[in-house]
A protein has these predicted regions:
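Anionic, Ser/Thr-rich low-complexity intrinsically disordered regions
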Residues: 1-120
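Catalytic machinery of carbohydrate-active enzymes
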Residues: 120-244
Length: 244
């Protein structure tokens, strides 16, 4: 017997990614049940995967990270300190999972939307302001938008329309247009402390906006400045297709 319940598409796709992972990970007789459940859901959800392939990929990646963290926890002889670290990482990934589901539901104007009770987290991102730099750092901004509930991105006025189109699908990415860098300089000694203390934002800066700027292996050094894995540049890069 089965029951049909109304759920948001984000929640349904989340369930499907977990079933995908189970079908990959479970290799005994239990796998048949996972395959049946996955294939049953896939019939109704395939069109949404085709519509939002990037979001589905990221959601599956987050759930795979949670799976692996739990796998390192259950039945393993680990210290209390390590157990606490794993639990903290799982909570962080669960929050990222919630944000990706919320992005999908927003794109579909879903009436059913999951909500969390925690205080919203905000970040401020200040990178180099050339249009090419904006594209190089798209992966970083997209990743941060899964770690924070709002990400403010500095951009030049003359590139505002281009950058708006780059993040048109995600209302949690807010643009902060300026004429040029001098507007928020000196950044490290004045603007950054003000943003952190008065606005309660976590500040991310790279390149010449860091305390001791050093450029190498461009643009990968920018990701090193942000303490983000270099793979994020390509894995999280996404620009939505515009309507014709």
């Amino acid at each position: 017997m089965s029951v049909t319940l109304p759920v948001s598409v984000g929640e349904a796709l989340d369930k499907l990614t977990i079933l995908d992972i189970k079908c990959d990970k479970i290799q005994d007789e239990r796998r048949a049940d996972c395959v049946l459940e996955r294939d049953t859901l896939l019939k109704d959800l395939k069109s949404y995967i085709d519509q939002f392939p990037w979001h589905y990929k990221i959601l599956k990646e987050v759930n795979l990270t949670i799976w692996n963290l739990q796998d390192n926890f259950h039945g393993k002889d680990i210290t209390e300190i390590r157990a606490g670290q794993i639990c903290t990482e799982i909570l962080k990934e669960n929050d990222r999972r919630f944000r990706v589901k919320a992005k999908i539901n927003n794109l579909l104007s879903s009436k059913l939307r999951e909500q969390k009770g925690y205080a919203k987290k905000k970040a401020f991102f200040y990178g180099h302001l050339g249009l090419g730099d904006m594209f190089w750092m798209c992966g970083a901004v997209r990743y941060l938008a899964t770690c924070y509930d709002q990400v403010v991105v500095v951009c030049k006025n003359k590139y505002l329309r281009n950058v708006q189109q780059m993040y048109a699908d995600d209302p949690t990415i807010i643009l902060f247009p300026i004429v040029d860098d001098y507007i928020i300089q000196p950044f490290q000694s004045a603007a950054k402390p003000n943003i952190e203390s008065n606005l309660g934002m976590t500040v991310y800066a790279c390149g010449y906006h860091t305390t001791n700027p050093r450029i190498y292996e461009f643009p990968l050094s920018f990701y090193d400045d942000l303490k983000l894995d270099r793979s994020i540049r390509t894995e999280y890069f996404y620009v939505p297709t515009t309507d014709v």
